[in-house]
Amino acid sequence: MCDMGFWAIVEKKTGKMIGRIGIEPKMWNGRNSVVELGYLIDSDYRRQGYALEACRAVLEEAEKRGARHLYCRIHSANLPSVNLARKLGFEKIDYHLEEEGNDINVYRYICNQ
């Protein structure tokens, strides 16, 4: 486990907050807590590389803080996030349905690869 945190994603040229990103503990499948990566980018700023840059910075920070693995859960229909996870080096390890019926893919990133 590592120290957790949340950060603002800020557009460099304007200083405007355009999203957020963080790592936090989660309980999955009754297992011990794992570290989950989550992010949200304002719709006007998506598909411009902000999430990739922010995720790379947070992965590096998580490794510095002692994380061994990071996980993310992504709706299978959210192809931009699926592609981002793959580009970052996450691998799909599980699949489940939420109570609401949403299908979720679970991805894992192994730190210090």
Per-segment meaning from a language model:
Residues M4-Q113:
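Acyl-donor (CoA/ACP) binding surface of acyl/acetyltransferases
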